[in-house]
Design a protein with these regions (language model features):
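A short glycine-threonine-serine/GTX helix/turn-capping micro-motif
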Residues: 62-73, 95, 127-131, 135-137, ...
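Flexible, acidic loop-helix segments that line cofactor/substrate-binding pockets
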Residues: 63, 96-98, 104, 167, ...
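Single conserved hydrophobic/aromatic residue that forms the stacking wall/gate
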Residues: 1-12, 165-174
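The feature captures the short pre-catalytic strand/loop hairpin that immediately precedes
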Residues: 45-66
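Oxidoreductase and adenylate-handling cofactor-binding alpha/beta cores
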Residues: 75-95, 108-119, 161-163
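N-terminal Rossmann-like NAD(P) cofactor-binding subdomain of oxidoreductases
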Residues: 13-52
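Aromatic-enriched alpha-helical interface/lid elements that frame and gate functional surfaces
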Residues: 135-167, 172
Length: 174
């Protein structure tokens, strides 16, 4: 326990206390005492393996997310844990210790990739702006710049197709 190891074991006398610890790698294990940074966790946790352009495209290869997504998401998870603990305390009178590790949070962000692998045997890979499961859903180059098309089903796809004055069967053949 982080409080006990810092000589703050008396905190246990305060049964209503809610406290949260945020670390890079958790309280135990070979990296428990090591510092962590968003970029490092993205690389170690596999997020960069699915972020960026495909390897066969110019600029392909691992990329970090453009915002400190692990830092931000870890903060949200910690805050949610604290709010849940405060709610529990209001109902039971008991405090709580919340332990949030950045690596755990980042691996949790890969839930869809894990599902694709565990259920379908598909190894996650970088797809650029394309979605790994839903097509068409990506950036398309146009004469005057790029356009993003996002559709979730055939009915949604019919709308942009009608705007382009193409027949749906011609688009399917392309």
């Amino acid at each position: 326990d982080p409080l006990w190891s810092r000589g703050l074991g008396d905190v246990y006398k305060r049964q209503r206390l809610v406290y949260c610890s945020v670390t890079g790698f958790g309280q135990t294990g070979p990296r428990a005492a090591e510092p962590a940074y968003d970029f490092l966790i993205q690389a170690m946790g596999g997020l960069m393996s699915v972020t960026g352009e495909r390897d066969d495209k110019p600029g392909g290869g691992p990329q970090k997310v453009g915002v400190p997504i692990v830092d931000l998401t870890t903060g949200v998870y910690a805050a949610l844990g604290i709010v849940a603990a405060l709610l529990r305390r209001s109902q039971t009178g008991q405090g709580e210790y919340i332990d949030v590790a950045m690596l755990d949070v980042q691996v949790g962000l890969l839930a869809n990739q894990a599902m694709n692998f565990l259920l379908g045997g598909r190894v996650p890979r970088r797809t650029g702006t394309a979605h790994p499961n839903i097509q068409p859903q990506r950036t398309f180059a146009c004469a005057d710049g790029d356009i993003v098309i996002v559709v979730g089903n055939d009915a949604q796809f019919a709308t942009p197709v009608s705007y382009t004055h193409l027949r749906a069967h011609e688009t399917r053949e392309d």
